[in-house]
Amino acid sequence: GGGARRWHGSCLRLPPPHRRRPHHTRCDSQVGSLADGGAGRSGARQRFELKEGGRGDGAAARDEITALTLGAGHAAAYRAACADLGWAPDEAGASAAEAQHVERLAALDAKHADAKENLGDVEIFDALLAKAQELAAEGAPRARVVEAFDEALAGTVATGHKLDICFQRMVLCLADHDLVGLKELLDNAQKLLDEGGDWERKNRLKVYQGVYFMAVRDFKRAAELLLSSVATFASSELFSYERFVFYTVVVASVALPRTELKAKVVDAPEILSAVGAVPHLESFLSAFHGCRYAEFMRAFSGIEEEV
């Protein structure tokens, strides 16, 4: 009903009407919190949550981000987080991490040279891909990371390898809040799959497409794609299955008619198996569908913090 509609924009942080961006543009939305796996920037999700959502206390968040960046030897990502969050960086630790990064790149270059000299195309591709992943995790400039992925891409004719690079670059786009780049990669991946791709990668693409449509506020298409992936979820580089169910339930609650919500979400075995693992989500869904609005509003306050 109309009352239920009023909370939708708040829950998913729609900007006010005069500031809404058209589809396919950059968007500093909750999309940034999704990218902390695969080829994403180290600590991207935690950094986003602390800056945009105000989640967690400062000391615990700093320790977590430092462990994910400096602790993993990724100095550029650490310095970027410090600059973004107003922290004074540990310069000695950052310098040591930077030296580790340089050593890793040198080792990967040596591995690539050895593969070219003594091994085959698969080993060459693996070395180039590993270097691109290292640059991405380090937080190297986007142009350098893309160039490294393109070099790996040029060394393979396998559709699966090309799709895997597309997915890893999509994670990078999510970390950088670049929805234009993400849309281009989604289109490229769809073309590759149309030419011939396996079911596992087709199912992974549906999740990425669902995330994109969620980010550009096309909640109906997002719900359709995410719901179609509930039984085949294979995109753990984006988020856990529980987090995937969380987004699916919230978006479906926004987009689906009540009868469809009951059939595809409220009574869905896969949803029921995971919904209890997410704080407030089970009571949010049950109360919303059952029109118990006092209970719903109590659950909603917890859900809003998680979105």
Task: Say what each PLM segment does.
Residues 1-307:
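Extended alpha-helical scaffold regions
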